[in-house]
Amino acid sequence: HLFSSAASDVYKRQVMQRTAALIAAWQGLGFIHGVMNTDNMLICGETIDYGPCAMMDGFRINQVFSSIDHAGRYAYHQQPAIGQWNLMALSDALLPIIDPDREEAIRLAKGVLEGYGPAFKLVYAERCAAKLGLEASDESDTLFQSLLEVMQKHQLDFTDTFIELESIRFN
């Protein structure tokens, strides 16, 4: 039982949490990978295959940078969900070594994968709040989401917006 032992913690922390943290970092920087298929993801949580990647200029939540991604599968706003999907694909490949009983292996893998959403949200909230010079909270999340809406409405450059905000000095 790989997932009922200490290896479960390794998988959770070292694969799921690193993937969540990596994609939260991308989102916080306005980075669009472009080709997040499973063979372009590393279990160590590092970015590879910089083919059609880009830093977002004018903010558009559904921005795509791969010329073949007509459906928007790897769009900016899809990256967190694709990260989770890729982890599910990895878990599916590992089912035979998780538990000999397939149903039990699926149950154990699902238990691990349920932590992805909260892990991503935590790191993303911390990164977004930090970009505004705040601690992560419901209020900082609301403020950041409102800022993204303004950025999208006016097609503001992702990086330049935060540089400009940083230059504001309050007495």
What is each model feature region?
Residues H70-N171:
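Regulatory N- and C-terminal appendages and interdomain linkers associated
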Residues H1-A7, Y11:
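Single conserved hydrophobic/aromatic residue that forms the stacking wall/gate
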Residues Q14-V15:
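Conserved alphaE helix
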Residues I32-H33, N37-I82, D92-P96:
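Catalytic activation segment of kinase domains across protein kinase-like and atypical kinase folds
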Residues A25, G30:
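Protein kinase catalytic-loop region centered on the HRD/HxD motif
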